[in-house]
UniProtKB/Swiss-Prot annotation:
Function: Reversibly catalyzes the transfer of the carbamoyl group from carbamoyl phosphate (CP) to the N(epsilon) atom of ornithine (ORN) to produce L-citrulline.
UniProt keyword list: Arginine metabolism, Cytoplasm, Transferase
Family in the record: Belongs to the aspartate/ornithine carbamoyltransferase superfamily. OTCase family.
Lineage, broadest ranks: Bacteria, Bacillati, Bacillota, Bacilli, Bacillales
Top-tier EC class: transferase
Record-listed carbamoyl phosphate binding positions: S57, T58, R59, T60, Q84, R108, H135, P136, C137, Q138, C269, L270, R297
Gene Ontology cellular-component terms listed: cytoplasm
Subcellular location field: Cytoplasm
Descriptive protein name: Ornithine carbamoyltransferase
Amino acid sequence: MSTVQVPKLNTKDLLTLEELTKEEIISLIEFAIYLKKNKQEPLLQGKILGLIFDKHSTRTRVSFEAGMVQLGGHGMFLSGKEMQMGRGETVSDTAKVLSQYIDGIMIRTFSHADVEELAKESSIPVINGLTDDHHPCQALADLMTIYEETNTFKGIKLAYVGDGNNVCHSLLLASAKVGMHMTVATPIGYEPNEEIVKKALAIAKETGAEIEILHNPELAVNEADFIYTDVWMSMGQEGEEEKYTLFQPYQINNELVKHAKQTYRFLHCLPAHREEEVTGEIIDGPKSIVFEQAGNRLHAQKALLVSLFKNVEELS
């Protein structure tokens, strides 16, 4: 591996993108692009990553397990329901025990506070694979996808339309960090968390990014380079049928995308519900790069894993 240096990160864990600098993010993306071209780099030979899941997963589980195999290591699936933690063992005790057995933890769960405690009590790296508040690995892959398309973040406008959820939160922090212009359009009452917006705005002041929270989807996508959406019903929210009516004006369809640049690209973190948050014409059309985006989860996470594991080795 002579062409690209492993990024040096000033953190043991990745819980949100707030923990990374712009330079660290760009280094991770460039390293991820290198690993995408050189899939079988045994940089984590013999390392074990524990994968704790309290939520269903396709992309997160497969990309982390495949990534560890390609790096020469092993991903160990740990069902949250089957672990003693599911029967009352404390997060703190679980963290200390796992630190004796394995080299890193990826956790996909509900409570962000639990992930913070797990990281605090672990002597090994902890990666947030998704909580109710944040999805940093997704946002890192999204930035990689945008960077591959444009080779820059300067002057790029990303429009997020839909529910101000965990993906939206991580994209706000990501866009602020790298200096992008991000607009968010949601129905009233479904805006992103106010504290996270404040953090993004504070970061944007330092980086020159522009962050706008709107309720008008046409205004949000006006002259956008990238349009992004997510499902209207997150896991555990199924049955809130009134949301469908409220969110209908926020569907990504041929009429709405007329307001974006002609060269716009469509992004979605998947899984998608066609004819709800996006029409089939858009997600399956020529402007969509959602499967390239999904593929980049693998490469971005591999870059993150190598960087965090190597960082811990150097510190110890």
